[in-house]
Regions:
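Extreme N-terminal starter segment of soluble prokaryotic enzymes
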Residues: 1-5
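Structural alpha/beta surface segment adjacent to cysteine/selenocysteine redox centers
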Residues: 16-119, 123
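Short pre-active-site segment immediately N-terminal to redox-active cysteine/selenocysteine motifs
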Residues: 8-11
Length: 124
């Protein structure tokens, strides 16, 4: 199976745009490959603190205005997760199954839950 390996944060709106764009282009061509292997790059740990919902909201406003107006329909600063660690644990479990389709789908489902459905995936 062909794979594109990316390191990405679950709560980063730029990652959401990039991953969706890759999957959209793949689908437009009627392809099921390459699959994305989305590796953990937790900005919460890199930065030493959780991401700020209002800062993310400002980034989303800019992304919708300039790049992908079709994304982020359900985003809400009020339900933005206070942590990404629970979600990263879930993606790690999906990755351990060895099923690349499942791992990609779980990673995208978590991002869609935050950015398209306005869900707080930081609750344990």
């Amino acid at each position: 199976m062909n794979t594109v390996e990316v390191f990405a944060d679950i709560l980063c709106p730029f990652t959401h745009v990039g991953l969706h764009t890759l999957i959209d282009r793949r689908s437009e061509r009627g392809l099921s490959q390459p699959r994305l292997r989305i590796r953990a790059w937790p900005l919460e740990l890199v930065n030493g603190q959780p991401l700020d919902a209002h800062h993310i909201g400002a980034e989303i406003t800019a992304l919708r205005a300039s790049v992908r107006p079709d994304l982020f329909d359900g985003f809400s600063v009020d339900t933005f997760p206070s942590t990404s660690m629970v979600a990263f644990a879930l993606t790690a479990a999906a990755d351990r199954t060895g099923d690349p389709v499942l791992a990609e789908e779980v990673g995208m489902a978590l991002r869609n839950a935050v950015f398209e459905e306005g869900l707080d995936i930081g609750l344990s």
